Amino acid sequence: MSSEQIEVVVAGHICLDIIPTFQPRTTGSAEFLVPGTLVTVGPAHLSTGGPVSNTGLALHRLGVPTRLMGKVGADLFGEAVLNLLRAHDPRLAAGMIVDEHESTSYSIVISPPGVDRTFLHSPGANDTFRAADVDVRRVAGARLFHFGYPPLMREMYQHDGADLARLMRRVKDAGLTTSLDMAYPDPETEAGRADWARILEETLPYVDVFLPSLDELLLMLERETFDGLHAGEPVAAQIDGGALSRLAGRVLGMGAAVVGLKLGDQGLYLRT
């Protein structure tokens, strides 16, 4: 698959999802996974997760020539990720980076029937993915560059997002349309405390399509509003149309050409 044939490059976060299967239980969440007990589970389902695989494989299934650019470690989990990609098309793993000094990112998805899902996540090699890992020569000739989940990639949000802005600027200068997908950072972690307003101000001038969810954008730009939300209620149900317009307008003012605010089951708020 040569660079001349590629239409879309999808880069950023990728991980191995390990999903144990559970039998229905009569006990509730309070009795589940009690310390010192053994819980019998069924076979584990393995799949790739993150935007590199989710978006990239969806485009591939639609027949769009796509190159995937993510980073894994030289370990068993990394080989599993590569093999899962190769199962769709042997060429899909060609753009992946294998770093012998890093471990592969993985998530354990604990999802018993009738109990809210719990995720155990190790960022692994995603934390060291940087602008230099994207060879602009391998991007040139494509029409779209899609980057996903900088809040889950340490090099992308440290130093006020200098590496994220550098990456998007280089790709934009190469003549590609750019899109940026976000993820929800834990508010109590380094990612959640990062100066996202500053990061977006530096990055969005090089982004054509910006795709955050409503709760992600509130956390990043209006922390007081975010902290005042009622837990357990859909965020979109607590925010009126005026607030959506205000948030979208602020993002457009930072430089993005199009903003698509994801509203869960309420759909998408799109503004140019």
Model-derived features: positions:
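Conserved phosphate/ATP/ADP-binding segment of small-molecule kinases
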Residues: A165, K172-T177, A183-T272
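Glycine-rich phosphate/adenosyl-contacting loop at the front of the ribokinase-like
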Residues: M1-K71, L76-P90, G114
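Conserved phosphate-binding/catalytic loop of the ribokinase/pfkB sugar-kinase fold
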Residues: I97-D99, V109-Y157
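Structural motif
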Residues: V9-V10, R143-G148, S179, L211, ...
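A short, aliphatic-rich alpha-helical micro-motif
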Residues: S3, V136-A142, E201-L204
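A glycine-rich helix N-cap at a beta->alpha junction
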Residues: L84-E102
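Active-site metal-binding loops of divalent metal-dependent hydrolases
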Residues: I14, P150, M182
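Hydrophobic beta-strand scaffold residues
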Residues: T66, L92, T178-S179, L211
